């Protein structure tokens, strides 16, 4: 059980066995740090008005400051809790943070007293808001700073990191044990039944956005009269102070005059003790010096392992660059147990970022030469700015020696090919497959036509299509992607992609284009519908190539023969037929015959219909003037479907 939870439980139940004292409140439920205060445990009041709740030198202790009289929170025992609010300024000075940590809590409790209760009743009628800090138990981890709400239970109902929200919604973290004064506002609204907690440095005004909110009626949990105050649990090296406090049980609280707050005392004695320990350590000679030298050499070798060479031109890509050390820790040293998958270009590892605990996927690839590295990283940085619901977000990269690491959002369901081929007990139904096709089409259309530049993916296949927890598809792995401006052809490069998805013109010229992506997408549509790979051994030679097999079955009048046997007859024949025919059109060997992705989406959505003589077009071996040769024009298509088919390029003079 964490210290914050222990502290909250302790503060909620330290009054457990006593009875409520129904004495009158001389302030009428409103006060600003007046003299009606009661202290208990390790707590005292300094002459300047500063309350110190923890002042232990040898072992951890507990202190309490509370308002001496019970305050009325209800008009009757069975009534509803009225609106109330409080604000206070506290400071925690920790000379040395420990894993055990320390903390402070504001409490509303039925009794006063600092008692230890071994058996906790879950109906103690108490409310507590706690602030806890502790040193991380990881070498490179961030210190813990938490705020939590506990209402009448042994578990925290709500908690979050300590800090405050700016007006633009950005969270600014606060170190609770920095020794600097921090102001807290706790407000309960009777109308909305909402409890808000806000905290901030006293150097700024109260933020408009609460840090922590919880909507819950407190009436069942509070008596008519309750005590309010603070409890503190600390380590031997921490001191907790309450500098100012204001409360109102009838609505909005009066602000504290910050100019009159007492100063937090310097912990010179504790710092002096630390300095003496350091001086003694430095005076040790001989064996200690040898040990230090050995440790220094070991540390140097460890740092050398994570050493990265950053060239001047990489500075512009800084926001997209991860350190190798972070990725090494995230993937547990790139262990095989963390491998999500692997292909011809490298392995993909699952990782957890050490600071944020965000799950990521890291693809490790080898870049064959330094030539073109700068241009490659420029494209990676550009793609990293893409934001689309059907694209896996590229978070950044890391470069170390001859290796590149691409960092993506983690997709919990993994890649599509696992569901198609490696998970016989989890079969994708037709509705899921059709939605996946539409998701990928939407993402690819965004890359080709809707962004400021044209992005050619160059490696569309099921292994690069990832699924989230709701089985929504996202196109990922931009390791081979190329960019070019709209209206300008991409440059010739090495042939990249996966066998079976590479278009004929790409293998001849080495020049990728949007139409080569459309070709791969067409093969993908056939693959997900038929449940088999583009090229593979089948019963007869005519079935070896997927596109040829589907076309032959269409020619013979039984195109539904190719549907994945695992689907049985649980599919919409009209949708399946559309996908198969559209897949053949997209994978046509003539680049100019293939539709653009915007047209593909129109066909899939039913906005446009395929031409009635599409089989002749797909079977055509000689195309002189595109659809006009077959008596099909964009005008005639527009007349029948109200949408014209947009082709990817001008027609070539050869066909399938």
Swiss-Prot record:
Membrane topology term: Single-pass type I membrane protein
Annotated ATP binding sites: 340-348, 363
Membrane topology (Extracellular): 24-276
Chain ranges of the Protein kinase domain: 334-615
Segments passing through the bilayer: 277-297
GO biological process: defense response to other organism
Residue positions with a glycan: 78, 124, 159, 190, 257
Reaction(s) this enzyme catalyzes, per UniProt: L-seryl-[protein] + ATP = O-phospho-L-seryl-[protein] + ADP + H(+); L-threonyl-[protein] + ATP = O-phospho-L-threonyl-[protein] + ADP + H(+)
Top-level division of the source organism's lineage: Eukaryota
Keywords: ATP-binding, Cell membrane, Glycoprotein, Kinase, Lectin, Membrane, Nucleotide-binding, Receptor, Serine/threonine-protein kinase, Signal, Transferase, Transmembrane, Transmembrane helix
Catalytic center residues: 459
Position of the signal peptide: 1-23
SMART domains: S_TKc (SM00220)
GO annotations of cellular component type: plasma membrane
Enzyme type, top EC level: transferase
UniProt cross-references to SUPFAM superfamilies, sorted A to Z: Concanavalin A-like lectins/glucanases, Protein kinase-like (PK-like)
Compartment annotation: Cell membrane
Keyword Iron-sulfur found: no
Topological domains, Cytoplasmic: 298-656
Keyword S-adenosyl-L-methionine set for record: no
GO molecular function: ATP binding; carbohydrate binding; protein serine kinase activity; protein serine/threonine kinase activity
Family: In the C-terminal section; belongs to the protein kinase superfamily. Ser/Thr protein kinase family. In the N-terminal section; belongs to the leguminous lectin family.
Name used for this protein in its record: Putative L-type lectin-domain containing receptor kinase V.2
Gene: LECRK52
